């Protein structure tokens, strides 16, 4: 039973064997020197021998050699990321949204994690008035002092709760700048989406 569950978790959208290119699309990751050395020593001895070989090889690297490895891996990552973004652009935002919903549903049913795709040319959705207020609160000590919110908050949950309470108690004239800015950002977003043909 456990084996069956693991197979289901592996066969998620992130590694799907289906023909749909969007379903198989996963973002590149920046490889480590260890990853690269595993590739370079493929077929060289059994597991323990190979790992010891890599350990000794890494231990003997000079600072310049380590930097060369890092530069090479960064170049590979940049090239892979560029290809990834170009591939994403070949799909419409609607297709990507549909795929994200499918991934979410499948991940929920298997208990797996999934990567949410995002069209490179679509801007992030504008922040709500409360989120704009929350960001200002985090970066403005004077505002925190005015609202009686202490500087040091132990947890993010407590920080959010304090911000939510402060927002609810905030006078309407104090809320207005955040509400107006949120509306303006929403209008800009909607205009861009329409002009770009994403709606």
Curated annotation (Swiss-Prot):
PROSITE patterns: HMG_BOX_2. It is found in: Nucleus. InterPro entries: HMG_box_dom, HMG_box_dom_sf, HMGB. GO terms for cellular component: mitochondrial nucleoid; mitochondrion; nucleus. GO terms for biological process: mitochondrial chromosome packaging; transcription initiation at mitochondrial promoter. Its main location: nucleus. One of its GO terms (molecular function) is DNA binding. Keywords: DNA-binding, Nucleus. Residues 123-197 bind DNA. Binds to cytosines in base mismatches and opposite chemically altered guanines. May be involved in repair of DNA damage. PANTHER family: HIGH MOBILITY GROUP PROTEIN DSP1 (PTHR48112), MITOCHONDRIAL TRANSCRIPTION FACTOR A, ISOFORM B (PTHR48112:SF22). Monomer. This is Cytosine-containing mismatch-binding protein 1. It comes from Schizosaccharomyces pombe (strain 972 / ATCC 24843).
